[in-house]
Every structure is written in C-alpha cells, then in structure tokens.
C-alpha cells in the first residue's frame, strides 16, 4: 500500500484552516494504516513531508533532526499530523513487526513540483506559486515580482516523477540493513528522507 493521500496546501491555506489540516490528515492516516493492517497488508509506504522538521533545522536535513526543536508555526498542525503518521507506522512495526511480519515505512520528500500542481496563489506550494507569479509578471510585462519571506530559507525541490521512482524503489528494495545508516538508536525507525542533501 502506498499512502500518499493528504490534505495539503501552502502557507495561506495552512494558516486559515489549521483544524482541517490536522484533523483530516490524522483521519486519513489512521483509517488507511489501520485498515491495511486489518486486511493483512505486509508492506506499506507512507509519504510524509519535510515540514516535520524544526523551523531552524540545519541544512541538509537529517532524519535524526525529527522532534529536535519547534516546528514552523504556519504549518504546525499539518506537521504534527504527519509526525503522528510516522509514529503510527513506527508503533505498528514495534508491536506487530515480528509477530505479523509487517514493514510500514515512511518517506519524507522535499518540496515537490510537476504536472498537476496547484497554481492558485492562495493554496499552492512554493514552486507552483513562484512559477505562477513569474508567469503572470511576464504576461503583464512587469519588471518586478514580490515573493514572500526574507529570501534566506533554503529549499530543495524534487520532480514528482523522481519521487514516484523513489517510492517504488524503497518499498520494493528496502533492506533492514539500511536502517543502521539512518539512526542507530531506534531499530523500529520507519522514515527516510528522499531528495535531501547527499547522505
């Protein structure tokens, strides 16, 4: 099972609808993961988000940085829901991994872009918003584009097709020995960053 379903949106949507973002994502994750287990699914891959990491995390982000500091306030409810999904997979592995031979994993993609993206400036993510702003400015012959923020945050981007390849590869080729390269202290760890840094 590949669990990619989620309520998603950009900064404005996250700020305006925090209850929807935490509630709907918690419901999706619990229902799908529990139903997968109840149906005898042995392998599940849950797609999280890089927003699970603290606001001031060092770059490139490492898996061990999870829960090491405060989250970005604008998307904290969404991030908390995604962290709960990770912990749910980890808990299923801890409780049922050996007895039921299950392996529920999580991938944390970077900022995605590609076909089918949402270009509505009120709900889009950063790449689609930038493309839309620059496209509109070009069409109106404007010489300047106003972007949000200070310009200092670092972002890593990944094409959605590359994530698709990574998802298939990880679920089909996951080797428990890979675990020792992520976080040695937690044998039940379920998550792996994809498309971040070089490690």
Regions found by a protein language model. Name each.
Residues 10-11, 46-62, 77-83, 87, ...:
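Conserved catalytic-site region of short-chain dehydrogenase/reductase
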Residues 52-54, 76-77, 100-129, 153-154:
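Flexible, glycine-rich beta-alpha linker
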Residues 3, 43-48, 105-111, 146-149, ...:
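Structural signature of the Rossmann-like NAD(P)-dependent dehydrogenase/reductase core
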Residues 31-34, 73-110, 129-140:
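Active-site Tyr-X1-5-Lys
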Residues 112, 127-145, 155-192:
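Alpha-helical substrate-binding/gating segment
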């Amino acid at each position: 099972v590949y669990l990619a379903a989620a309520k998603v949106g950009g900064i404005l949507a996250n700020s305006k609808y925090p209850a929807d973002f935490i509630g709907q994502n918690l419901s999706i994750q619990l229902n799908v993961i529990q139903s997968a287990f109840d149906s005898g699914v042995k392998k599940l891959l849950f797609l999280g988000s890089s927003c699970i990491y603290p606001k001031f995390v060092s770059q490139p982000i490492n898996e061990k940085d999870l829960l090491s500091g405060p989250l970005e306030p604008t998307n904290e409810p969404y991030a908390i829901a995604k962290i709960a999904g990770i912990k749910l997979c980890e808990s299923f592995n801890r409780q049922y991994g050996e007895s039921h031979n299950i392996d529920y994993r999580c991938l944390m993609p970077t900022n995605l872009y590609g076909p089918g993206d949402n270009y509505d400036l009120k709900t889009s993510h950063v790449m689609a918003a930038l493309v839309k702003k620059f496209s509109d400015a070009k069409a109106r012959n404007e010489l300047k584009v106003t972007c949000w923020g200070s310009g200092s945050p670092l972002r890593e981007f990944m094409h959605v097709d590359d994530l698709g390849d990574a998802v298939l590869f990880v679920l089909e080729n996951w080797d428990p020995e890979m675990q020792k390269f992520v976080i040695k202290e937690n044998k039940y760890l379920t998550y792996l960053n994809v498309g971040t840094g070089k490690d």
